[in-house]
């Protein structure tokens, strides 16, 4: 299934899964989060996920390298500072956190696989191909970075 590698932008996958999560949210069973404060959990996750994604994008812009997930070969510099000291993929992490918050807001058991499916898809069809390209482009420097910083957290 290599033909899916680097084909669909992760934000589109997140939106599609979010719509799917919403679509199945009326199916039982439902769960009660923190005495019906699921909206607060969702808000914290959405703001947190958005902030993580924003900080990651700002860091890449400051380094004057590509923000396009479909073109990792256009990367001009290996960014290992800022939020990239803790996660090699903070933009995808932010989307996963936001999807998790949306699942909490929906309070529907059938929406829970959404964030998991996002992580599985992005790991296989986005991150692994990116890692191959970055390894070829930056060699030992990238290999050292991967040993020091985890893929997600």
Model-derived regions: residue spans:
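Membrane-anchoring alpha-helices and their flanking helix-loop junctions
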Residues: 1-81, 93-153
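Solvent-exposed interhelical
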Residues: 84
């Amino acid at each position: 299934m290599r033909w899916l590698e680097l084909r669909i932008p992760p934000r589109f996958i997140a939106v599609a899964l979010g719509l799917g999560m919403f679509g199945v949210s009326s199916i039982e069973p439902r769960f009660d989060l923190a005495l019906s404060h699921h909206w607060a959990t969702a808000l914290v996750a959405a703001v947190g996920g958005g902030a993580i994604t924003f900080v990651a994008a700002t860091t890449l812009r400051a380094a004057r390298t590509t923000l396009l997930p479909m073109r990792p070969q256009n990367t001009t510099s290996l960014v290992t500072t800022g939020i990239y000291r803790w996660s090699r993929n903070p933009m995808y992490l932010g989307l996963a956190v936001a999807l998790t918050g949306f699942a909490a807001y929906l309070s529907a058991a059938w929406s829970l696989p959404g964030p998991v499916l996002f992580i599985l898809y992005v790991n296989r069809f986005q991150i692994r191909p990116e890692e191959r390209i970055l390894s070829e482009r930056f060699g030992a420097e990238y290999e050292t970075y991967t040993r020091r910083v985890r893929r997600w957290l």
